[in-house]
UniProtKB/Swiss-Prot annotation:
Protein name: Tetraacyldisaccharide 4'-kinase
Pfam families in the record: LpxK
Electron transport among keywords: no
UniProt keyword Lipid biosynthesis present: yes
Gene Ontology biological-process annotations: lipid A biosynthetic process; lipopolysaccharide core region biosynthetic process
Disulphide-bonded residues: none
Enzyme Commission designation: 2.7.1.130
Length: 371
């Protein structure tokens, strides 16, 4: 956004900040009280309006708890879902709702973590109550609240807040002047801050220094690209991972930061010959997908999209079938925590009172002796 335009929005940003801070003060002074869940709660959220890599981090936290023997439950708002109220997306055995009913990211989390309970609820408290009632005989070990830093109605044992390294933290401003939903100083509420999407440590240095000065535990991470998964043909059966190198592709997506998707593909060796992007969570139409398929056919390109977009289309098989006559792939991504991983794991362990077993000392073999 240009400087004159930002200045024009500044009065509205100041008004929005005043409203947000008034509400926060009501919680800080216990005028509004946070409800205590019967299960420990971990919140994964952010300060800005999307694009921080929050969903992959939720996925990482869920997988970590599963790896150490705990059963987590995820509660998400289910952004842009078509269902209403509180809905059970997965019971920890079966995925019960489509991406249209659950929301793109929530459906993706459910499919990628079949052992986790997943619920969508506009009011997260109602989601906790559904879990408590439905799974009274086997309560989950921990509740993971997706995108809940601003949702202070539920008390939490751990607040993890993500900051996008691609957006200079020093220059960040409140909506609508910038992308912040809360002032930067509110990071003091966080138990752990994750500076995510770091691609260049030198470029991220100003943000790192600013965050370190706030005195909160800081974790550094980047998004690591994983496999290219083929979903053409039978959309319910995924083939073996593809080799990205030398693929000529038409990239399409509906995400907050599509340019980072293209960069990831190019980094993996994909030749991106054409692109088509829509706004985050925008619906695909049959007309649009036919146009994408036609252009890809004319240019001899395969189709590549994001994992989130794949799961969005999976809930609409009539749309998915339009493109699957061509080779189609989606790109998996995951957080690569390269600094502070042990710290984050320690914080997550404390929530569920988990004490890792110490590694046995390595046996030192004596040198062979001749007698």
């Amino acid at each position: 956004m240009s400087n004159p335009l930002r200045l024009a929005f500044r009065p509205f940003a100041l008004l929005y900040e005043a409203i947000v801070q008034t509400r926060n003060q009501l919680f800080n002074r216990a005028v509004l009280r946070a409800w205590e869940s019967p299960m420990p709660v971990v919140s994964v959220g952010n300060l800005s309006a999307g694009g921080t890599g929050k969903t992959p981090m939720v996925d990482w936290v869920v997988k970590y708890y599963l790896s150490i023997g705990f059963k987590p439950a995820i509660i998400s708002r289910g952004y842009k879902r078509q269902s209403k109220g509180v809905q059970l997306v997965s019971d920890g055995n079966n995925v019960l709702l489509s991406s249209r009913e659950a929301g793109d990211e929530t459906a993706m989390l459910a499919w990628n973590n079949p052992d986790a309970i997943v619920v969508v609820a506009s009011k997260r408290k109602q989601g906790v109550k559904l879990i408590t009632k439905r799974f009274a005989q086997r309560l989950p070990s921990v509740i993971i609240l997706d995108d809940a830093f601003q949702h202070r109605q539920i008390a939490r044992s751990l607040d993890i807040v993500l900051v996008n390294a691609e957006e200079p933290f020093v220059e960040a401003a409140m909506l609508p002047e910038g992308r912040l939903r809360e002032p930067k100083k509110n990071l003091l509420r966080a138990d752990v801050v994750v500076l995510n999407k770091i691609t260049d440590l030198e470029a991220a240095t100003p943000s790192i220094k600013a965050l370190e000065e706030m005195g909160r535990p800081l974790v550094k991470a980047r998004l690591s690209t994983g496999e290219l998964i083929c979903f053409s043909g039978d959309a319910t059966t995924l083939d073996e991972p593809a080799t990205a190198h030398h693929l000529n592709a038409f990239a399409f997506a509906g995400i907050a930061k599509p340019e980072s998707f293209v960069t990831s593909l190019q980094h993996e060796g994909v030749n991106v010959g054409a692109t088509r992007f829509v706004r985050d969570h925008a619906p695909y139409s049959a007309k649009m997908l036919r146009a994408i398929r036609r252009q890809a056919e004319e240019q001899g390109l395969c189709l590549i999209t994001t994992e989130k977009d794949y799961f969005r289309l999976l809930g609409q098989p009539e749309l998915l079938s339009i493109i699957t006559a061509l080779p189609c792939y989606y790109l998996k991504i995951a957080p690569d925590i390269f600094d502070g991983k042990a710290l984050l794991q320690e914080k997550l362990n404390a929530v569920v009172h988990y004490v890792p077993k110490p590694e046995p000392p390595k046996k030192i073999e004596e040198p062979y002796r001749r007698w």
